[in-house]
From Swiss-Prot:
PANTHER family: 30S RIBOSOMAL PROTEIN S2 PROKARYOTIC AND ORGANELLAR, SMALL RIBOSOMAL SUBUNIT PROTEIN US2M. CDD domains: RPS2. InterPro entries: Ribosomal_uS2, Ribosomal_uS2_bac/mit/plastid, Ribosomal_uS2_CS, Ribosomal_uS2_flav_dom_sf. Belongs to the universal ribosomal protein uS2 family. It comes from Bifidobacterium longum (strain NCC 2705). One of its GO terms (molecular function) is structural constituent of ribosome. The keyword Ribosomal protein applies. HAMAP family: Ribosomal_uS2_B (MF_00291_B). Residues 233-281 are annotated as: Disordered. The lineage of its organism: Bacteria, Bacillati, Actinomycetota, Actinomycetes, Bifidobacteriales. The keyword Ion transport does not apply. The gene is rpsB. Residues 255-275 have a biased composition (Low complexity). This is Small ribosomal subunit protein uS2. GO terms for biological process: translation. PROSITE patterns: RIBOSOMAL_S2_1, RIBOSOMAL_S2_2.
Length: 281
């Protein structure tokens, strides 16, 4: 269950919706009242939806899934990048490029191009066999690609789920996810249609503190899912469908020696996982 209280949500301003004249009637079920022309969101219902979203993300990751974090509005960029990086999940915090999901093969080629450019030494004019101008242009290309695609550089396949801040602004991302059958968890304000996502979280999607709180919470769900995934693999003595990456192992610093039996490793790993579980920021 998500570790969040009503007090946390109130302090973060998650109960403030948009002006009443800008509302979407489909959000009526999540609106408590209105004050000074502003809709007030029913945070009791928000808490229920948060728990559902949290459990979904945790379960998805525990079953070897990945979650793509998306938030390109100014208020969300830092939280999206920081929290996704914390649990080593892919993210998009700059402009969403059309086809990032539906044309993933082409996007992957651009990511590979980025990795190629990162291997170059742009200060070695003589060794590269290129002119200073050519190296400068290539370096600019690298910087541009990194800004656009750096967050998904390690995403080798389309994600299992997507977490979105502001589905109105990220309408294209949500649309692409739906075309591929990818479930979406999203912060949904009073001006949006909650029916367009599978796991809506009714809340203010403009307040920086609120965005940070919910994004951090979803990252915690990912971390919990990673620990559960590792624990299940050890208990059953089976390899995961996908090998654990180095960054996942770093989350488990108290991992038992590989040569120990599965029965002996499971209790020790459980203690280590509890001690190392990331805290909400």
């Amino acid at each position: 269950m998500a570790q969040i209280t009503m007090s946390d949500m109130l302090k973060a301003g998650l109960h403030f919706g948009h002006q009443t004249r800008r509302w979407n009637p489909k959000m009526k079920q999540f609106i408590l009242t209105q004050r000074n022309g502003i809709h007030i969101i029913n945070l009791f219902k928000s808490l229920d939806m948060i728990d559902k979203a949290y459990d979904f993300i945790k379960t998805t990751v525990a079953h070897n899934g990945t979650v793509l974090f998306v938030g390109t509005k100014k208020q969300a960029q830092e939280a999206i990048a920081n929290q996704a990086t914390r649990v080593n999940m892919p993210y998009v915090s700059e402009r969403w490029l059309g086809g990032m999901l539906t044309n993933f093969q082409t996007v992957s080629k651009r990511v590979n191009r980025l990795k190629e450019l990162e291997e170059m030494d742009f200060t070695d004019v003589h060794g590269s066999g290129l002119t200073k101008k050519e190296l400068l242009l290539l370096e600019r290309e690298k910087d541009k690609l990194n800004k656009q695609l750096g967050g998904i550089r390690n995403m080798n396949r389309t994600p299992s789920a997507m977490f979105v801040v502001d589905i109105t602004k990220e309408a294209l991302a949500v649309e692409e996810a739906h075309k591929l059958g990818i479930p979406v968890v999203a912060i949904v304000d009073t001006n949006a249609d909650p029916d367009t996502v599978e796991y809506p979280i009714p809340a203010n999607d403009d307040a920086i503190r609120g965005i940070e709180l919910l994004t951090s919470l979803m990252a915690d769900a990912v971390a919990e899912g990673l620990l559960e995934r590792s624990g299940a693999n050890k208990a059953e003595g089976e390899a995961a469908e996908q090998p654990m990456a180095a960054w996942e192992k770093e989350l488990l610093t108290n991992e038992a020696p590989a040569e120990a039996s599965a029965e002996a490793a499971a209790p020790a790993a459980a203690e280590g996982e509890t001690a190392e579980a990331p805290k909400a920021e």
